Amino acid sequence: MEFLERTYLVNDQATKMYAFPLDRELRQKPVNKDQCPGDRPEHPEAGGIYHCHNSAKATGNRSSKQAHAKWRLCAASAICFIFMVAEVVGGHVAGSLAILTDAAHLLIDLTSFLLSLFSLWLSSRPPSKRLTFGWYRAEILGALLSVLCIWVVTGVLLYLACERLLYPDYQIQAGIMITVSGCAVAANIVLTMILHQRNFGYNHKDVQANASVRAAFVHALGDVFQSISVLISALIIYFKPDYKIADPVCTFIFSILVLASTVMILKDFSILLMEGVPKGLSYNSVKEIILAVDGVISVHSLHIWSLTVNQVILSVHVATAASQDSQSVRTGIAQALSSFDLHSLTIQIESAADQDPSCLLCEDPQD
């Protein structure tokens, strides 16, 4: 019969940390063979203990989301490559700068999709002694690089559009342009459908979108705008050949919309890199949940942040009465917070008699 060996940290009244193995408790209760290591027992006994890190449910959710993200990115890459080649050929034949620049946008998208796939693989690597949290943030860095690619290619489009406004000496085959741009719109709509994810946040008991797929979705959404601009300009030029200026004008307008679409994703990722509270979680609500646990007198040094989207970490200092069993309090807090599927939970138990009301580090953060 196999037994799990676990080690827990409990803070004594002098706030010194001691580590001790809980061999006695583990000998009393064998491990369920059908239960994943680190998962919480279905029916913990009174005073029972379960592992402090993420549950098997959270681990399974992470693996499932990674698999879905990889499938979506692979499918998007294949579609993107096919229609990129089609637009290069069609744009060259039609003599349309808008189609060629849209093909260039697809090339950047393809590069970003492959970069996102690489970052997903990198984020699945195990932690090292130097990178103790692992490579999860590689997913965010890859997504930010993807946004940077959007800015670069959109800047090029704006420059070329301005150049055509100043020097309108060019010819366009509007018929071919309509056919190619129409197919591009359809292809990009398919891309957005593949990459679209639901994003309700924790209050709706749903998960937030994968960072890499979310950035890829913004790319595809930008491609839809760009392709629509090409199609609109093609229709205008087809019916009114003298209005070929519509080609650079539409490119200019929808390039601005593409830039605007990246602002929100950049804001969310910046907050994540600044160790902000994850979107959908409320600091005050989490604190109230902890205070509601039997034996908890006060809560301070509560920190909530994310390694990456859906990888939430929480650490907290909890003051209890000297007569209170620290292990039962820790277990109660972990059970109360289990609905959040935390990646890692650290609880430091302290004596209420040792609290210092004048300590600035123990004060609640500002609103």
Swiss-Prot record:
Which reactions is this enzyme annotated as catalysing? Zn(2+)(in) + 2 H(+)(out) = Zn(2+)(out) + 2 H(+)(in)
For side Cytoplasmic, which residue ranges? 1-78, 124-139, 196-216, 266-367
Give the Gene Ontology MF terms in alphabetical order.
metal ion binding; protein homodimerization activity; zinc ion transmembrane transporter activity; zinc:proton antiporter activity
Disrupted gene: phenotype observed: Knockout mice lacking Slc30a8 do not display overt developmental, morphological or behavioral phenotypes. However, a significant difference in plasma insulin concentration is observed.
One GO cellular component this record assigns the protein to is: secretory granule membrane
Q: Where along this sequence does the record place binding of Zn(2+) 4?
A: 343
Asked if the Swiss-Prot or TrEMBL record annotates the protein with the keyword Magnesium, the reply is no
Extract the Gene3D superfamilies matched here.
Cation efflux protein transmembrane domain
User: Keywords assigned by UniProt?
Assistant: Antiport, Cell membrane, Cytoplasmic vesicle, Ion transport, Membrane, Metal-binding, Transmembrane, Transmembrane helix, Transport, Zinc, Zinc transport
- Give me the Lumenal, vesicle side stretches, as residue ranges: 100-102, 161-174, 238-244
Tell me which SUPFAM superfamilies the record gives: Cation efflux protein cytoplasmic domain-like, Cation efflux protein transmembrane domain-like
Q: Where does Zn(2+) 3 bind?
A: 51, 53, 359, 362
Q: Which residues bind Zn(2+) 2?
A: 52, 300, 317, 350
Q: How does it sit in the membrane?
A: Multi-pass membrane protein
Give the tissue specificity: Expressed in endocrine pancreatic islet alpha and beta cells. Not detected in the brain.
InterPro entries (alphabetical): Cation_efflux (IPR002524), Cation_efflux_CTD_sf (IPR036837), Cation_efflux_TMD_sf (IPR027469), CDF/SLC30A (IPR050681)
Residue ranges crossing the lipid bilayer per the database entry: 79-99, 103-123, 140-160, 175-195, 217-237, 245-265
Record-level GO BP terms:
insulin processing; insulin secretion; intracellular zinc ion homeostasis; positive regulation of insulin secretion; regulation of vesicle-mediated transport; response to glucose; response to interleukin-1; response to type II interferon
Which parts of the sequence form the motif HCH Motif?
51-53
Query: Where would you find this protein in the cell?
Result: Cytoplasmic vesicle, Secretory vesicle membrane; Cell membrane
Give any extra note attached to this record: Each subunit of the homodimer independently transports zinc ions in a pH-dependent manner. The cytosolic pH promotes binding of zinc ions to the transporter binding site. Upon change into the organelle-facing conformation, the two histidines of the zinc-binding site get protonated at lumenal lower pH, triggering zinc release into the organelle. The transporter then moves back to the cytosolic-facing conformation where the two histidines get deprotonated at higher pH, resulting in a net antiport of 2 protons.
For this protein, the record's NCBIfam families field holds: CDF (TIGR01297)
Q: What does this protein do?
A: Proton-coupled zinc ion antiporter mediating the entry of zinc into the lumen of pancreatic beta cell secretory granules, thereby regulating insulin secretion.
Describe its assembly.
Homodimer.
Q: Which PANTHER family match?
A: CATION EFFLUX PROTEIN/ ZINC TRANSPORTER, PROTON-COUPLED ZINC ANTIPORTER SLC30A8
Name the chain's protein: Proton-coupled zinc antiporter SLC30A8
Gene name? Slc30a8
